[in-house]
């Protein structure tokens, strides 16, 4: 009997040793990295004058806007008539000013979704849409189609979550919110969350030739894995567009002007016209002007001195242009192993680890090799991720390769913020029509320990 017991113990131990690594070591997203923010602040080599430009831009980026500019602590002008936020820094906040959506689970600055309180700020009478929650991401909403007399037509545009109706600085305005309940019932609403702005001056300073050469350098291996990729381009001159979820914006100035217009309702030199009905227009248009007298700023508590410097839109672009890229965490044995696996399974074929800038006007930003982990091309991601919106050459299921620098401290993932779990975000790439499907198959074939190493690597970025 004793000999049988010993044999049974040996057999059981051998069985546990055989299955142990798969069952005991369950892979999981480590979560957003703690400690100091690995991003924020100006690019380290900038000269004193360039640092001043950045600091002025930062002030404008953090400014809170109201309709009139006369509300206490809301000195910016031009909010509305429809809007999603009242400050650039409100949406771009994690892990530091210029980042992605804030949230309650931030190790750096835990805050609820600011859009919830914004709905009724200063007397506004908005209802909070059901897709905006205290513990969820900041979102914008777009309608896939719009109803016309002949049926339906493509839409794809941003529909502001809120209006200025009821606000103390918007007397007489009576503008209804979009009927989100009806459109949600039609499955006609898609969402997007803020993209981080860190290091975008380096991205802007990378030539089209460099981007095309980078994509060509992996063509053979990509072809074997079913990865194609193309660049979204400007319809006039054919140059590569690279900013936004679908790489739909050609320049940081256009990116900035669009953000002011569709997110805050502020008309500007790039988008000069209001987007809502008459009766709710309280300011001259455009409301943000570049290099000329700006009466709106003069009435906003500047002592009558009209602003003659760069507009807020130009300052936004300068902020993104001069902000330093994210700094990764110190490497560990696990993250180093994960970096090798990232290359082995093919993640790096789209998430290119490094690119090099061309000549730059800014000190220390010429011929710089940087690590965005993106090819800035758009790829078919399949209908599981498709938003059914076309922007330029980017079709309904195509998205720009999301840069992974800074992903270690990000709270929400994918274009619509549908998950806070990095592992779920990776596996969501496994759609039937997705170019990443074979890469995800190889990822899923890794051992749990290897998957954990890869996750640890990503959270170190």
Regions found by a protein language model. Name each.
Residues 1-4:
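Positively charged n-region of N-terminal signal peptides that target proteins for export
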